[in-house]
């Protein structure tokens, strides 16, 4: 059984309470987004989940679910046949990372525009 509270804490700690799409601070009411969608076989694991504002998740015009092609290019959505670890995520500050099973960023390219 998935421990959602624990997963939320791990993801929130990793992103330091910033939205992993827009870079603005998160409130208690944020979405855990499956990069590899559950409909594509995605798992409820810290290395497959990112923290997003609801408008960045599925409510806003620039949300990942309304812009699948762009979200796939930036790694916010992972193709069905890809492993999330092997499909880098572009953070709002321009850094490119892999998400680890320990709940950390593995930096491929690091930029410190937001202090991440």
Where do the model's predicted regions map?
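Short cysteine-rich loop/turn motifs with clustered Cys
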Residues: 2-31, 53-55
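Extended interaction regions within the primary functional domain
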Residues: 7-8, 35, 91-94
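Short linker/helix segments within small regulatory modules
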Residues: 36-49
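Residues that flank catalytic or metal-binding motifs in active/ligand-binding sites
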Residues: 31, 47-49, 85
């Amino acid at each position: 059984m998935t421990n959602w509270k624990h997963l939320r804490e791990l993801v929130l700690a990793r992103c330091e309470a910033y939205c992993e799409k827009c870079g603005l601070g998160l409130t208690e009411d944020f979405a855990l987004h499956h990069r590899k969608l559950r409909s594509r076989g995605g798992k409820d694991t810290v290395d497959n989940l990112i923290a997003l504002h609801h408008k960045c998740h599925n409510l806003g015009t620039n949300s990942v679910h309304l812009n699948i092609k762009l979200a796939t290019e930036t790694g916010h959505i992972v193709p069905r046949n890809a492993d999330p670890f092997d499909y880098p995520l572009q953070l709002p500050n321009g850094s490119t990372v892999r998400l680890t099973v320990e709940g950390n960023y593995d930096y491929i390219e690091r930029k410190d525009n937001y202090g991440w």
